[in-house]
């Protein structure tokens, strides 16, 4: 059965079988930080960049690939897909996700945190959500969404 899934998905799934069937480890991810990106000028000073840095944290011991959905003030939605290096491949987006689908660099399973850039200024982001489709068996979803504070 595992080999059928690997053939159909065109990726290695031994790691998933080992974690899911042979351990009691759990899946738990969180949005650890959202901050404006900076860029260094030719004079050496830093200025705000027109993008946002998002840092995710793996709190559980079960690594999984992630889909992080970002929505801006205009209603545009991006899905940042973060594969695991263990997979040696990546998921193909569903047809309705194809526009705005952005594959990121693999997340090495030994690293507890991962940072990526969103091409939108922080003040134009309405929300950032890990696993909007709720397909991930995350044990604590309370830390899976970030929204700007209403000050």
What are these regions (language model features)?
Residues 1-43, 47, 52-54:
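Amphipathic alpha-helical substructures
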Residues 51, 63-67, 125:
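Exposed beta-strand and adjacent loop surfaces of beta-rich binding modules
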Residues 56-60:
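Asparagine-centered strand-capping/turn motif at beta-strand->loop junctions
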Residues 68-72:
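Conserved aromatic beta-strand anchor motif in extracellular beta-sandwich/beta-rich domains
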Residues 76-113:
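Solvent-exposed beta-strand/loop surfaces of large extracellular or lumenal domains
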Residues 106-123, 140:
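A surface-exposed beta-strand-loop module
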Residues 132-142:
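Short acidic/polar inter-strand loop motif in beta-rich domains
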Residues 141-149:
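Terminal edge beta-strands and adjacent linker/stalk segments
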